[in-house]
UniProtKB/Swiss-Prot annotation:
Residues forming the catalytic site: K125 (n6-amp-lysine intermediate)
Needed cofactors: Mg(2+); Mn(2+)
UniProt family annotation: Belongs to the NAD-dependent DNA ligase family. LigA subfamily.
Catalytic activity: NAD(+) + (deoxyribonucleotide)n-3'-hydroxyl + 5'-phospho-(deoxyribonucleotide)m = (deoxyribonucleotide)n+m + AMP + beta-nicotinamide D-nucleotide
Protein name in the entry: DNA ligase
Binding site residues for Zn(2+): C418, C421, C436, C442
Organism encoding this protein: Acidothermus cellulolyticus (strain ATCC 43068 / DSM 8971 / 11B)
GO MF: DNA binding; DNA ligase (NAD+) activity; metal ion binding
Length: 695
């Protein structure tokens, strides 16, 4: 279970001493499991909470703060099976801040010491294993883990097995005679699931997260095992050196990159608090676009001279701090496993858990994806489990904490019949997906399809919420979604939910009818999305609507004709053919058409200004969401691309643009701000070019 954290500072010195001793013992035990065994039993956030409580007690009772307290030293010690090696310079940890107020207080302390001329280098805090590399005359001679900050583990052979670690630096300019660099070894998120699947197939325990996978892969006794795994290094600091001329950390990064060392392409120098906060906010939103996990942003004073003036404590530099995002991984108790029936009939298991706060919200349910995933992860009812919530993504169970099992846990048995309608379930997709085949009549599937139709990505029917949908289903007014647009005031008056005491329609009934009338005029691509054709999302729907122009043309097209549309392909084409082959699906289209739902694109006589033009959007726009910007480009006849190439005509740049902006500058592609984008949409490319920024 998660460790319990006291919320108040003990009132007496005796109580404080007792709690202090408990915390020291608990923290040191968890530090050993995390840093040495690579098998933590609590999340990073829970560990941070214990450390913060210890710091609060020591601040209130300074006599309890000793040199060997966890707050005063770097955690971790060399494992017995690796030779110990002493770092040339101490390899410190970082102090953490968790709020804007704490960050501002740190900046104020920095400026009090060194003045307001400090610049700050910001970069994502990679969640991996800290390492130290030593180069002599450009040749890699040693690689080590951080250990306790003074002595680490000699893992040179394994470091050399990492694909992007140079064994010899490029001689671009004057190489330092001695160069000690610090970095983070990480495991790419995209490769993590594949690694765990292979471990389970081999009868081995899976890793709980990519950070543990990185640590476990680097600490292999056989370097060939390390070499077989897709580890990567990113360098983020400098230790001892002889002959490095840079005056700033950002300048040093340029030199390191020229010598062949991998440094973060996302590091950015900020000169104001607002710029720092904007950077932190950007990666809070876009952290899951990165190839590696991050748990915050590191902010460093950029000038080396100011770093030296600020100095360090025994544990951390005073010139750097880690801004930690709300935790995305925590541990809690798995109380039960139940199943949910989706709009396409797919039956998905989900975890019912003790409430736990993760990524800024309290969750009690988390997805388990499918029956095979439960077996692969080895999750049992009653387990203490690691739960992850990535931004707005549905929380998921990552895996069990096997070390905390007590024998009372039990296996989950997948149901054989649909819990909503009682129909026998069937396996599809090679046995991975389990579905209820009663698509038309299963109340759970129809309810989910109604929610999908009402969603913003489909027909955007605001008043068709949970209660309204349930009321319509319970009243039997809807045999299927085809009846939705046949609702009338007379029909709604028969449902208590939609009437007032005097029998007149309630406000929500009037609004529902108004919303349905508005939904009839939505563009064709939204109608296609609303029909719940498997695999047809907004991108494919837009492409189909542009190419064919009407439901009838799509229905009559061959699989080959459908598949030839860019963004569609054969899988979606066959899914469309299969959907229209079902009689009651055809009835839905007929009912909606008869009710006045638009089944064809509007005929526009004016030429589209962006015909043949490819546009890429990067960064955050104030006047458009990403989806609405893409829709605007496509409505104007253009192509909205996801990456920059020589074929790109314009790149639209908002706040905090990514690497697409840099590539556009390298290729000499016209770059537009929001005003330029508006001009492009309304007046076309010729007018926009005069407003474009060029390298």
């Amino acid at each position: 279970m998660s460790p319990a954290r006291n919320t108040g500072i003990p009132a007496s010195a005796a109580d404080a001493a007792r709690r202090h001793a408990e915390l020291v013992k608990e923290i040191e035990e968890h530090a050993y499991r995390y840093y040495v065994l690579d098998a933590p039993t609590i999340s990073d956030a829970e560990y941070d909470a214990l450390m913060r409580e210890l710091e609060e007690i020591e601040n209130a009772y300074p006599e309890l703060r000793t040199p060997d307290s966890p707050t005063q030293k770097v955690q971790g010690a060399p494992a017995a099976h690796f030779a110990p090696v002493e770092h040339l310079e101490r390899m410190l940890s970082l102090d953490n801040v968790f709020t804007e107020g704490e960050l501002r207080a740190w900046i104020a302390r920095v400026e009090k010491e060194v003045g307001t001329d400090a610049a700050y280098l910001c970069e994502p805090k990679v969640d991996g294993l800290a390492v130290d590399l030593v180069y002599e005359d450009g040749v890699l001679v040693r690689g080590a883990t951080r250990g306790d900050g003074r002595v680490g583990e000699d893992v040179t052979a394994n470091i050399k097995a990492i694909r992007n670690v140079p064994h010899r630096l490029h001689r671009d300019g004057n190489l330092p005679a001695l160069l000690e660099v610090r970095g983070e070894v990480y495991f790419p998120v995209a490769d993590f699931a594949e690694l765990n699947a292979g471990l389970v197939a081999a009868g081995k325990a899976p890793f709980a997260n990519p950070r543990n996978a990185a640590a476990g892969s680097l600490r292999q006794k056989d370097p060939r095992v390390t070499a077989s795994r897709p580890l990567r290094l990113v360098v983020h600091g400098i230790g001892a050196h002889q002959g490095l001329a840079a005056a700033r950390q950002s300048e040093a990064y340029v030199a390191l990159a020229a010598w062949g060392l991998p440094v973060s392409e996302r590091a950015k120098v900020a000169t104001t608090t607002k710029e720092i906060l904007d950077y932190i906010a950007y990666y809070a939103e876009h952290r899951h676009d990165l190839e590696h996990e991050i748990d915050g942003v590191v902010v460093k004073v950029d000038q080396f001279a100011l770093q030296r003036r600020l100095g360090a404590t025994a544990k951390a530099p005073r010139w750097a701090v880690a801004y930690k995002y709300p935790p995305e991984e925590v541990t809690t108790k798995l109380l039960d496993i139940q199943v949910n029936v989706g709009r396409t009939g797919r039956v998905t298991p989900f975890a019912v858990m003790e409430p736990v706060r993760v990524a800024g919200s309290t969750v009690t349910n988390a997805t388990l994806h499918n029956a095979d995933e439960i077996k692969r992860k080895g999750v049992l009812i009653g387990d203490t489990v690691v739960v992850r919530k990535a931004g707005d993504v549905i929380p998921e169970v990552v895996g069990p904490v096997v070390a905390l099992r007590d024998g009372s846990e039990r296996e989950f048995v997948f149901p054989s019949h649909c819990p909503a309608c009682g129909t026998p379930l069937v396996r599809e997709n090679g046995g991975v997906d389990i579905r209820c085949p009663n698509a038309r009549s299963c109340p759970a599937q129809l309810r989910e399809r109604l929610f999908h139709i009402a969603s913003r990505g489909a027909l955007d029917i605001e008043s068709l919420g949970y209660e309204a949908a349930n009321a319509l289903l319970e009243s039997k007014l809807l045999a299927d979604e085809g009846d939705l647009f046949l609702l009338t005031p007379e029909k709604l008056r028969t449902v208590p939910f939609f009437t007032k005491k005097d029998g007149e329609l309630s406000a929500n009934a009037v609004k529902l009818l108004e919303n349905l009338e508005s939904a009839k005029t939505r563009p064709l691509w939204r109608v296609l999305v609303a029909l719940s054709i498997r695999h047809v999302g907004p991108t494919a729907a837009r492409a189909l609507a542009r190419e064919f122009g009407s439901i009838d043309a799509i229905r009559n097209a061959s699989v080959d004709e459908l598949a030839a549309v860019e963004g569609v392909g054969r899988v979606i084409a066959e899914s469309i053919r299969d959907w229209f082959a079902v009689d009651w699906h055809q009835e839905i289209v007929a009912k909606w058409s008869a009710a006045g739902v638009r089944m064809a694109e509007e005929q526009r006589s004016a030429a589209k200004p962006l015909a043949g033009i490819t546009v890429v959007v990067t960064g955050t726009l104030s006047r458009w969401s990403r989806d609405s910007a893409i829709e605007a480009i496509q409505d104007a006849g253009g192509r909205a691309a996801g990456s920059v190439s020589k074929k790109t005509d314009f790149v639209v740049v908002g706040e905090n643009p990514g690497s697409k902006y840099d590539k556009a500058r390298q290729l000499g592609i016209p770059i537009l701000d929001e005003e330029g984008f508006a001009t492009l949409l309304t007046k076309g490319p010729d007018a926009a070019r005069s407003m474009a920024q060029r390298p």
